[in-house]
Every structure is written in C-alpha cells, then in structure tokens.
C-alpha cells in the first residue's frame, strides 16, 4: 500500500510576487485525500484553513523546518493557497511538492530546482 500522497506545483514569478498560488487539481485532490474534513469542500467562500507542514531541509527527520500551508477560497469560490517562507526558498521554475507521510502524519514540502522562467 502506498505510504504517501503527493501534489506538485511548478512555481512561477507571479506566484512568488503575489505569495498566492491557484490550487491545481493535484493540490485539491491531495488535501481531499489526506485531510478529508479540512479540504476546500469545507472552506466557505472568503474563508481559509491552515495546515501545519514542514520544509525538507536535508535528509534527516530532524532537519525539517515548520511552516504553514494556508488554504483560501475567494468570495467567488476560487481555490488558492500560500506557503509560509516560499519566497525565501524558491525561484521561478522550481517545482514544489507536498507529500503526506502517513507514518508521521506530516505534510513535507520539498523544492526541486528547475529552469529559470522569464
């Protein structure tokens, strides 16, 4: 049985400038599967929820840095998110992955270096 669920987002300069990211299908499915009662289906238009997560800063369980993933819905219903500290860690072209580790019940945020986007 799979021990993890994942979501992936390719970071753009606009995401970094605005600190707001449109939730793609993988993010919506990730939240729905990992946190069924906290997902976008349970956020009213104009509301938000906060999930505790951890940046993977190395290969050791003890090298994770706490962060927050904020899930939002605009008044018209658009699904958005922001990740605390992302602008200090990522650049346009990087790929951000959310991974749910069922064993520890943690969301791990990983950044993969990508090509620069202009």
Locations of regions flagged by a protein language model:
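Acidic, low-complexity intrinsically disordered regions
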Residues: 1-118
